[in-house]
Amino acid sequence: RPVELVVVDNKSDKVEAANAVKRLTEHEKVLAIIGTYGSSLAMAGGEVAERAKVPVIGTSCTNPLVTQGKKYYFRACFIDPYQGAAAATYAYKNLGYKKAAVLTDVANDYAVGLSNFFKKSYKKIGGELVADMKYSSGDQDFTAQLTELISKKPDIVFMPAYFAEGAIIMKQARELGATFVLMGADAMDNPDTVKIAGKAAEGFMQTAFPYDMTMKDMNDQAKAFTEAWKKNFPNKDPNVNATLGYTCYDMIIDALKRAGKADREAVTKALAETKGLATPVGIMTLNANHDAEIPVGILKYENGKRIYLGEIVPE
């Protein structure tokens, strides 16, 4: 029996996200949903899915609250406490940076959460936090914050921004003569980051999901995904949500096979029991909170290209 894929656009809006899930559960009568990328969108749609008792797997919704107390919501990604701790560990232990600062979008739950987890972990392992700067979504001029950061002389600045905003920050930082290393998180993982930032992206680092086309040791599932992507989109590199969407599909098909029937409750139960599943982002096991236990990847930008450095396990 073939699998039918029904696509609905949530328009990156919380109200539309809830409406999209309602349409899929009530009108399309879907068995399961491959969920959204943003945590706020996932939480808005998740409430609808919970009431409808339809299993959902989010792609890159990393806020811990997404799955907290939810029976029907799962995710194919790690969560922000783990990612923030990994960034702090890499900055302090692997790079040897003893002084850090953060630059946070206070209007974004994702950014606020990640910054808090980074700060807590960085100080816990011995690092010194020299500045804690803020801005709001939509800001275009970061001169004041960057000037203050330059005066504090951090070794590294952690900024969990979305890629378009983060690229602007990179450009303005270099124009002001900043020499500190800039480090972002998974929301910066987009091929357009370099296109927007240009030469200012040189030396930028970020945490990422454990897949990239530059990986030296790609597993069989990652190879299969990459080959399929290149065949269908020869002029475009895959982004992280494409990889995780593919992973979510694998997880649903695996759960459906183990459930033995196309039943929402049976598939939900099988998803909760996901363990040791080979996927493009590694061996997938879901914990009791329905969160994926996968490593955190590290990317660096050199000579206009992304380089996958490997994985990090936080302290």
Residue ranges and their predicted role:
Residues 1-4, 27-32, 51-55, 69-72, ...:
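Loop/turn elements at helix/coil->beta-strand transitions in domains of secreted/extracellular proteins
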Residues 1-68, 76, 135-142, 164-167:
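Beta-alpha junction/loop-to-helix N-cap segments that form part of ligand/metal-binding clefts
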Residues 17, 76-99, 112, 141-143, ...:
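Hydrophobic alpha-helical segments within soluble ligand-binding/sensing domains
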Residues 24-37, 57-59, 101-104, 153-163, ...:
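Periplasmic-binding protein-like
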Residues 48-49, 114-209:
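Extracellular/periplasmic bilobed ligand-binding domains
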Residues 73-137, 156, 234, 252:
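An alpha-beta-alpha
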Residues 170-246, 257, 300-314:
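Extracellular/periplasmic periplasmic-binding protein-like sensory domains
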Residues 229-243, 251-305:
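Segments of small-molecule ligand-sensing domains
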